[in-house]
UniProtKB/Swiss-Prot annotation:
It comes from Homo sapiens (Human). The modification Phosphoserine is found at residues 162, 210. It comes from the Eukaryota. Keywords: Chromosome, DNA-binding, Metal-binding, Nucleus, Phosphoprotein, Transcription, Transcription regulation, Zinc, Zinc-finger. PANTHER family: THAP DOMAIN-CONTAINING PROTEIN 7. Chromatin-associated, histone tail-binding protein that represses transcription via recruitment of HDAC3 and nuclear hormone receptor corepressors. A motif (HCFC1-binding motif (HBM)) lies at residues 229-232. It is found in: Nucleus; Chromosome. Residues 198-209 have a biased composition (Pro residues). This is THAP domain-containing protein 7. GO terms for biological process: chromatin organization; negative regulation of DNA-templated transcription; negative regulation of transcription by RNA polymerase II; regulation of DNA-templated transcription.
Amino acid sequence: MPRHCSAAGCCTRDTRETRNRGISFHRLPKKDNPRRGLWLANCQRLDPSGQGLWDPASEYIYFCSKHFEEDCFELVGISGYHRLKEGAVPTIFESFSKLRRTTKTKGHSYPPGPAEVSRLRRCRKRCSEGRGPTTPFSPPPPADVTCFPVEEASAPATLPASPAGRLEPGLSSPFSDLLGPLGAQADEAGCSAQPSPERQPSPLEPRPVSPSAYMLRLPPPAGAYIQNEHSYQVGSALLWKRRAEAALDALDKAQRQLQACKRREQRLRLRLTKLQQERAREKRAQADARQTLKEHVQDFAMQLSSSMA
């Protein structure tokens, strides 16, 4: 498993490219080390509940050298190896904290300020001069009001068919904090162009059920209940089970092939031994035949010499 930086918003991993760039990884001090609290406090990362500071249970938590200042390292040896000093603490986390605050600001809707309320009030007052008296404008509800109540989520067919149907200036709705800027632009457009008397507003027709209503009832993804302390996620358990079964089947097949190869090797060894024995017997028979022939030749030579004498 490759090492990676556990700081919020940092995606640096221990690869060949990062090592060539001179980026090193340093492990979080153990729980009995007083510097551990400083490291966790400076990284400004919250626990999964979002209440306190992040205190991981794993012993393999690393921070890359981009979060340390230059004076936190020292040169060691002739090769120029940069080693982290004993009392070094990571302090460079500003950019990642700003990024996290920006994403949080985008994800929540806050009530408009006094300047926006006064601008919307003046715009609605100019538009109401041509329509008649209206009820006084009320500011949008506070941010703690839920934007999507259960009644609207259970009956999506009652939503308007198009965003053209705007709310009245005096009415307050849970969607007013989301439709505030859009409603102001639509009111300005309505002030510039008066509606013709021939065009009558058509009754709202029920729209088809959006697929998002069914997406809310889908089960969570596999491994969603597992607490993630790292930037990677555990895959599907069913997928890993299938991979394990496929690996076991491949291992069983390889073992059967190995046993068959061993039996074939044993048969070949026995056949080779028999051939060697037959070859040795043939050599001994040839040697005996030569010796017998030599003896016969010597006897014939002796008989021939004795007969000539």
